[in-house]
Amino acid sequence: MRSVAEEAGMSLGSLRHYFVTQSELLAFSMQLVSERVTRRLKELKLTGDPRQNIELIVAQLVPLDEERLAESEVWLAFMGRAVGDSSIRAFSLQVHDQLYNGFLSIVSGMVVQGLAAGNLDVELEAKRLHALVDGLVVHGVTRPERLTAAEINRVLLYHLDQMMDK
């Protein structure tokens, strides 16, 4: 919490006035990230090309620039803390479910629009896409020198190609 207080230009005591525990601070930060990503998704300028639109949407969830890297760092810290902290566990499950439902919607839309490979299992593919994005976030945050933004994008595009049987 000390480093957050320093970066915010506040005393540790002032920060603790608002957030008694580090978990409260992380939950608040995660809520802000969730709101930012939701706003960014709503403001996306869709192209009319379903494939490009899917790429644009999924790209909002991985660390491709400084803003998304910072959001990814918050997500990773929050999820790591939620594993052992029951006070924020319910919120972490809500965040997880919200992401999964988004991926399920993407994959379902691909099937409805005839973009998906013929024998695609919608629920399994949504879980696979969710796991891929989570993994790209973890590696993009913890080892950015080994998995650059360009490589993250390449992995996503390759995976979408497989889903679309291209």
Outline where the language-model segments fall:
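Amphipathic alpha-helical segments used for helix-helix packing
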Residues: 53, 66-90
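A surface-exposed regulatory interaction patch that couples sensing to output
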Residues: 64-72, 106-117
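Short alpha-helical scaffolding segments that buttress acidic/His motifs in well-ordered protein cores
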Residues: 57-61, 75-79, 129, 133-136
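Helix-turn-helix
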Residues: 1-24, 28
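Alpha-helical structural segments
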Residues: 7, 24-44, 52-63, 94-101, ...
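A conserved beta-strand->loop->alpha-helix hinge within the catalytic CA
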Residues: 3, 49-53, 121
